[in-house]
Amino acid sequence: MNATIFAFLLLLNLAMHNATEQSSETDMDDTLLIPEINRGRCIEEGKWCPKKAPCCGRLECKGPSPKQKKCTRP
């Protein structure tokens, strides 16, 4: 019985390890790190970006005119 439980736990561990490897295969250009988002001094994606505060992380301030600029991904 102990061997059965051990085998079950081993298979469960392997399954969880494979699931975490697959979920961590994201492109770093498409993700922002949490400290970059919640810095407080920067503007998040989709928000209006005045000259006073920069956009967070790799976001850029883009728009058709200076008054209509928003923080967007490059």
Curated annotation (Swiss-Prot):
Keywords: Disulfide bond, Ion channel impairing toxin, Knottin, Secreted, Signal, Toxin. This is U4-theraphotoxin-Cg1a. Belongs to the neurotoxin 36 family. 01 subfamily. Disulfide bonds join 42-56, 49-61, 55-71. It comes from Chilobrachys guangxiensis (Chinese earth tiger tarantula). Residues 20-39 form a propeptide. Expressed by the venom gland. It is found in: Secreted. One of its GO terms (cellular component) is extracellular region. Coiled coil: none annotated. The keyword Disulfide bond applies.
